[in-house]
């Protein structure tokens, strides 16, 4: 089905008098806005805002991709992710739409995939269910396909969701996961292309890439390769920044690996207080080669215990991470050893 070819004839889309300006491949152009019946649209499963929710669903269901041949079943799944990812923002957006209607037009592809406006679409679905009245989503329709225009679509999505039209920011972890997927894993975009799309500097994005790689390494360390949802509740973005800063100053690769393993172990256990401040104290140790050597020697037995506990787990979950983190022997070992290193 092509919305532009079938929609006007079959009367499930209607052209409005409104237009929306988009910049695609450096060309700025005003595009017509249409009112599209909700049942002809489907969510974008490549939306970075829900990337960790997608990875969790795939892991739990042992699948590589969510099947969207049954559009309504697929939409119900993603609807839940969008709602749970930021329920407060959802409530505010829905109240606003109910009061004054949809103000900002979204962007969809000709096959019905939503590129911009997933939250607004979700709110309209809720309103339709609540009022039992057919609702329409207002959006530009681009005659593009995800198969043949993937890079252009991703750059447009980033520009709309991170740039001028952004209303609610990404969670920091979702942003890192998106960067890892788009730049490191699939190599869909270069650092320069990503930076341009979100109006940021290449230097900042390069640092984000390194943090994203460290996040992926952390998941490998806990035997949960690419299970990014496990990092959602650990609040690792700022601690990863501190770890990246430490590693830049160390030349010896073996020392780098030992430090990463020690810090990754403490990401799980959170021995005391705020994790970012705690990691900064480790950074103070790392600034002195002698103190760092002593610290890593102290940490080794406890790191090995963490690894042993991880090896005993068949499938890692948030609950299992919590249980390992609360292991009395491990937690006390870290809390005793690290303050000793601070005072040397």
Language-model segments: which ranges?
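Amphipathic, charge-rich alpha-helical segments that serve as recognition/docking helices
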Residues: 81-82, 129, 134-219
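Extended, amphipathic alpha-helical scaffolds
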Residues: 278-344
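Amphipathic alpha-helical "recognition" segments
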Residues: 132-137, 176, 201-273
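Tandem CBS (Cystathionine beta-synthase) repeat/Bateman regulatory domains
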Residues: 23, 170, 180-181, 186, ...
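Short active-site loop/helix that positions an aromatic residue
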Residues: 119-135, 265-270, 283-290
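Short, charged/polar connector segments at secondary-structure boundaries
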Residues: 1-135
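Exposed alpha-helical structural elements
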Residues: 73-77, 92, 154-155, 239-242, ...
């Amino acid at each position: 089905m092509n919305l532009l070819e079938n929609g006007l004839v079959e009367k499930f889309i209607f052209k409005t008098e409104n237009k929306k300006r988009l910049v695609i491949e450096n060309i700025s152009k005003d595009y017509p806005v249409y009112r599209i019946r909700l049942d002809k649209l489907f969510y974008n499963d490549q939306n970075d805002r829900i990337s960790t929710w997608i990875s969790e669903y795939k892991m739990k269901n042992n699948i590589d991709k969510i099947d969207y041949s049954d559009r309504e079943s697929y939409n119900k799944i993603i609807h839940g992710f969008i709602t749970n990812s930021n329920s407060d923002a959802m409530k505010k957006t829905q109240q606003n739409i109910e009061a004054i209607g949809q103000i900002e037009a979204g962007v969809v592809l000709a096959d019905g995939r939503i590129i911009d406006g997933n939250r607004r679409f979700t709110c309209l679905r809720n309103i339709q269910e609540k009022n039992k009245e057919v609702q329409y989503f207002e959006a530009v329709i681009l005659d593009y396909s995800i198969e043949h225009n993937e890079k252009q679509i991703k750059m447009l999505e980033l520009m709309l969701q991170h740039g001028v039209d952004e209303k609610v920011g990404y969670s920091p972890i979702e942003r890192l996961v998106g960067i890892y997927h788009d730049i490191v894993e699939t190599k869909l975009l270069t650092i320069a292309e990503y930076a341009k799309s979100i109006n940021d500097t290449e230097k900042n994005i390069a640092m984000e890439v390194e943090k994203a790689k460290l996040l992926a390494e952390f998941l490998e360390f806990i035997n949960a390769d690419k299970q990014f949802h496990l990092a959602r509740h650990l609040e690792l973005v700022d601690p990863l920044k501190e770890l990246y800063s430490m590693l830049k100053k160390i030349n010896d690769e073996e020392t780098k690996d030992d430090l990463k393993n020690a810090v990754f172990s403490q990401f799980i256990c959170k021995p005391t207080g705020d994790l970012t401040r705690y990691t900064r104290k480790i950074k103070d140790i790392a600034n002195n080669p002698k103190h760092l050597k002593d610290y890593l020697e102290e940490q080794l037995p406890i790191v090995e215990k963490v690894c042993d506990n991880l090896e005993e787990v068949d499938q890692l979950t948030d609950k299992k991470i919590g249980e390992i983190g609360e292991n009395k022997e491990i937690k006390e070992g870290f809390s005793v050893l690290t303050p000793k290193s601070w005072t040397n």
